[in-house]
Swiss-Prot record:
Belongs to the splicing factor SR family. The modification Phosphothreonine is found at T719, T931. Residues 55-64, 97-110, 144-155, 186-222, 239-249, 810-841, 874-922, 950-980 have a biased composition (Basic and acidic residues). The gene is U2surp. This is U2 snRNP-associated SURP motif-containing protein. SURP motif repeats lie at residues 430-473. One of its GO terms (molecular function) is RNA binding. Residues 92-121, 192-232, 837-915 form a coiled coil. It is found in: Nucleus. The modification Phosphoserine is found at S67, S202, S236, S485, S788, S800, S811, S946, S948. InterPro entries: CID_dom, ENTH_VHS, mRNA_splic_Cwf21_dom, Nucleotide-bd_a/b_plait_sf, RBD_domain_sf, RRM_dom, SR-CTD_assoc_factor, SR140_cwf21.
Amino acid sequence: MADKTPGGSQKASSKNRSSDVHSSGSSDAHMDASGPSDSDMPSRTRPKSPRKHNYRNESSRESLCDSPHQNLSRPLLENKLKAFSIGKMSTAKRTLSKKEQEELKKKEDEKAAAEIYEEFLAAFEGSDGNKVKTFVRGGVVNAAKDEHETDEKRGKIYKPSSRFADQKNPPNQSSNERPPSLLVIETKKPPLKKGEKEKKKSNLELFKEELKQIQEERDERHKTKGRLSRFEPPQSDSDGQRRSMDVPSRRNRSSGVLDDYAPGSHDVGDPSTTNLYLGNINPQMNEEMLCQEFGRFGPLASVKIMWPRTDEERARERNCGFVAFMNRRDAERALKNLNGKMIMSFEMKLGWGKAVPIPPHPIYIPPSMMEHTLPPPPSGLPFNAQPRERLKNPNAPMLPPPKNKEDFEKTLSQAIVKVVIPTERNLLALIHRMIEFVVREGPMFEAMIMNREINNPMFRFLFENQTPAHVYYRWKLYSILQGDSPTKWRTEDFRMFKNGSFWRPPPLNPYLHGMSEEQETEAFVEEPSKKGALKEEQRDKLEEILRGLTPRKNDIGDAMVFCLNNAEAAEEIVDCITESLSILKTPLPKKIARLYLVSDVLYNSSAKVANASYYRKFFETKLCQIFSDLNATYRTIQGHLQSENFKQRVMTCFRAWEDWAIYPEPFLIKLQNIFLGLVNIIEEKETEDVPDDLDGAPIEEELDGAPLEDVDGIPIDATPIDDLDGVPIKSLDDDLDGVPLDATEDSKKNEPIFKVAPSKWEAVDESELEAQAVTTSKWELFDQHEESEEEENQNQEEESEDEEDTQSSKSEEHHLYSNPVREEATESKFSKYSEMSEEKRAKLREIELKVMKFQDELESGKRPKKPGQSFQEQVEHYRDKLLQREKEKELERERERDKKDKEKLESRSKDKKEKDECTPTRKERKRRHSTSPSPSRSSSGRRVKSPSPKSERSERSERSHKESSRSRSSHKDSPRDASKKAKRSPSGSRTPKRSRRSRSRSPKKSGKKSRSQSRSPHRSHKKSKKNKH
């Protein structure tokens, strides 16, 4: 009975409170109507009421004073009432009896009191400060009788939402909703002062907990966003750690990538990460160098070097960093190829790092990939369409323009329009905005914009149909109109216009698919060429080791280990060591140390190390040079003791090599002799080169099929060419050079046999001298023949005496010029062409190459075979034809050359002999007048000579001419012949001048002067006889 009264009072108070809220809705009305008076409660139940009412009073005050600002108390109170009025009063339950209602409420009050007491202890006694203080639902503490017993929400603790809920449009409370009894405020103040102090503390803690809850919700949102992009499971970190990692990402979006570069990043086993951890970076290396080094493997999403910030980090003298690729495949290739590689003298130590967000556009694109994303060059076709051949090979030349319309349409229908996304962000945004309005408003909008922005350079893509921006605009507009998404589109080729070109859309994101195989091969073009060679850093390190090498065991061991570790470049290392031993100024201890290094490397060349055996092979070719240089060093040592010490150390190496059996004993003996100076390496090279040339000609010179001495000694127009293809030429073999075959065979037998190929200059000197001697006498004959030819043309009406004289000169000219090819090979002609130039030899090679090509075509059936001839005969006939053509060309060139030489000599002789021409002619005229008995004239009015002197003179002239020609051919170098030439020269020189003067006069005078020419040799002959006597 004692517990029934509080339930009744609570019911009455709730009714009063409900009516007050509906009537006024003010907080003062709530406070006046919430507390029951003392007269309403029985006296036996009053001792229990202070405890309950005290808690309710505190709870209501907490809810009212919860806001940091007093001016917000009213709307907050209404929201609280709204949020807590969940239980609805139903009129259907009022039929229950008062007794049943009291029993039911008694049980619920006991449960609620126990829960509230626990909450009270937790909130005010500080048992768990981190717990959020909760509110009791309105129907839990003071539920009405008419509430449903089966309500699912009954008995549950309410968790409040954020304090900053939307207060602009609060929903209207329904007529059935009533304020909860939890907010009833008593008029009596609680007797405990300690509770008041705790009340203030709980208000602060409540506000703090709500702020924490807001922060947690925000952290959860950021964590979810990050997990979707980073492919990582949800983390179970504490609130403080999550806040510390996410605060910078809220300040700056790009810093979210950098926050993951924590110093302790390590491989978390994520199979989708593209981020590489670099653990050993040179302090002088920057991000740009990393881009150049790692960008060869694919586009990069981010590059970051963790620069040292403390003295301890700077003391390490190495940095660490991260390089993130756009896709996993490129990152795996970079890890495989660069892990352990020396970059700027630091060995790269790579590993997988934590995944980072991948941006839409990379920060670095490889040049090979950039070329494929660039627009194609101008082609002249509509929309800059590219022919398929040129699209595959951009360096291919442009095709000529089609001649007719059909060819143009065919080329256009097979071409491809390549769409490239513009890289300029402003232009790309403008194109997208334009497409948006054109799709919405129609083509009239595009026409209006073109009319309005005709002078705006930003809208040039609407007018210039060949530009990549217009191609992208046209494709993107078509794609949107066909139903494609702005971010996802179809990538297969299609025709936009009927009978037009194919359009090739851009890939969705080319950087996420990795580099193609062609681009990978382009990126690694230089790798195969570097195989078997030291890198620049390794070469510098080797040179540094050799410069600082001393005869200490540890130093030589370290150098030997370096050589074996880089055995792939054994040849380059051997060359470097050989070069270091060839310097005479090197101190003796360093030379000995380098020789010991050679010995150690040779000893370990049989070790189970990859490519170590290469050292034995490459050192074998260089040891002769090494010991020759050591011999030069040994001879330059001044002190006897020092030289003996040096010698003993070198000989110790020989004894060790003999024990190790690295090389055979004869080779070691040879090396020892080279070092002691008993064998000269240069002489050995010469003796080794002799067997290569035993055949008398190098391999290159045998291309023309003839030995060197035969090629040099025979002119091209009279060459027998016996062994061009191994078969003698029958038609040209017999008497080509005018010498019988037996004589040539005997002369060949008498020739000395050369063990070494004779020099091509040995047979040149005599032939040149002989040719020069012949040419000096030859030009005089040429002058006489030319003069006699001129006289013959001018003196057709001469007498028989002059005709005989000219006939003799004609016969001599015929002997010199009109002979056949076989008669040209006289002694003088043969000696003139004794030396064969390189040009003639080259022509012979060309002829033989043509013959070989002709023979190959005959054998393969490209050329028809002539009936009645074998292959060999047809080839020989072809060779003869080529040689005959070459001979004719050579003869024409020789004639032109001789003609030019004659003209030069004539011009010189004219200038010298014009001065002495007049005086001798007057003397001859006087002599003629004095010797002739009867001055009778000829038929033309001139003197007529007696027949007897004329015949005598003609006979004398013939004899003198024959004797002079004989003396020239037989006694070429005799002094008598020289004196005869000197005496004949004035008469011979006067004759052509007089004949030239006679051309301007009548033929009679020319005839007279031609007779004087015939007498001139006779007189010179008489004078020579007088001189003899």
